[in-house]
Amino acid sequence: MYSGYNHYNRQKSSTGTTIIDPNSAWFAQEPHWPLIEDLLGGTYQMRSRHRKYLPQEVRELDESYDNRLARSVCPPYFVRLERMMAGMLVRKPVRLNDTSDDIRLHMFDVDLEGNDLNVWTYETARKMIRYGHCGVLVDAPAAGQAGRPYWITYTPREILGWRTEMIDGKLKFTQLRLLEKVFEPDGLYGEKVVEQVRLLTPGAYEIHRKGKNNEYVKFDEGTMSLPEIPFAVAYSNKINFMESRPPMADIAELNLKAYQLQSDLSNQLHISSVPMLAFFGFPQSSEEVSAGPGEAIAFPAEGRAEYIEPSGNSFEAQFKQIDRVEKQINELGLAAVLGQKLSAETAESKKIDRSQGDSTMMVIAQQMQDMIDNCLMFHGQYLGSDGGSCFVNRDFVAQRLEPQEIQSLLQLYTAGTITQETLLTQLHEGEVLGDEFEVEEEIEATESGGLREISEPIEEADESMPEQPADE
């Protein structure tokens, strides 16, 4: 039977009997992850998978395959595109609105790992774009213990299962299982990785670790100060609740194809770049003929020797095929995300493509914004303060206002058609004012006399002029 069926028709679900067993949604998503995860590891990771991504040809010796594998380099198209898309969201800092001062202070180290809100948003957006969605747990020390809330990001691979109920008109988690890895000291200098499952229920948690019989047993438990599970989710390509597909899976497949094509071309160029010396006219019964420096060859009457090398016509076709794959990657990446194509097109089609591309990124930005809003809400509930809301950048391409546009805004403000707040907001979004500029603070400063008026200098009397006598 064809062995490929073992991969494409593999088990999609299992009967969950232990706390470590994933649910059916996890099994439905898992086949889409390995290629993307291996591409993130770069050339070293792709080489370590050897025949999985770079097949060994029929009658190709193992030694020849190892040499070909060592010369193969995986181009980083997928990784660069993922970084570019995530970077668009934080091209301008995430803006907080109506957030209390203590929470704003926590946003400078949102995950207790030294990452501020913008860096955390960038890394979380990469995971969301990579897998299709991700979740964030707003955790905090138990009541009475020192510490403050912090945010932990989980990928779909680490979300093993969940249960939900409709409570007060909202779908809320009643059970959540999260896979974690923690590092613990091992001896004087070493460390070991411990795999554990965090089981969350409203107001409580349990930690389960693998025991001596390879069965997970309860290691720790406790209560949480919130009556619900503080877990927020954001999607980039939603299929069902807590289920998604990687939005760039097609680009990952094209990246793999480019890796294989470049490997084939590099191997053929390596072999054919050295011409082969051929001898003609020697009888088959003659001894083996060799040529080299300091050697003389006695040719038969009709014998001759010449170098044979390929014409290179097939190489041109392979180069063109690689160019076509790279063009497909550029068009899928730039056109679908930014609405820009490298090929020629009409102005109207550019507008349509731009709106579609912006809509794709708009959904990602809106999902990220909603998730941060929910995390701020949970964060505020822990502290008993107002979490407020946020605004995630939607200006994905740098577009600085032109001088004519700035002049038009100033004329509208002078005529009283727009307010000072509208003027400053447009100048700030148009990148005329810096990222650190705060519109509300500027308005308050001007209204309270923050702009100091410089008094006119007092003219000093000229000492050379005699004083005029006072009138009697």
Give residue ranges: language-model regions.
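Extended, helix-rich architectural segments
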Residues: 1-151, 459-472
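Short secondary-structure junctions and interdomain/linker hinges
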Residues: 88, 92, 96, 114-120, ...
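Short amphipathic alpha-helical segments
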Residues: 104, 112-121, 128, 250, ...
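Short secondary-structure capping micro-motifs at structural edges
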Residues: 120-124, 313-317, 359-360
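Extended, regular secondary-structure scaffolds
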Residues: 129-238
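Residues in well-ordered beta-strands of folded domains
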Residues: 137, 177-179, 298, 391-395, ...
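Extended, charged amphipathic alpha-helical segments
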Residues: 215-348
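C-terminal helix-loop subdomains that flank or include functional centers
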Residues: 317, 324-472
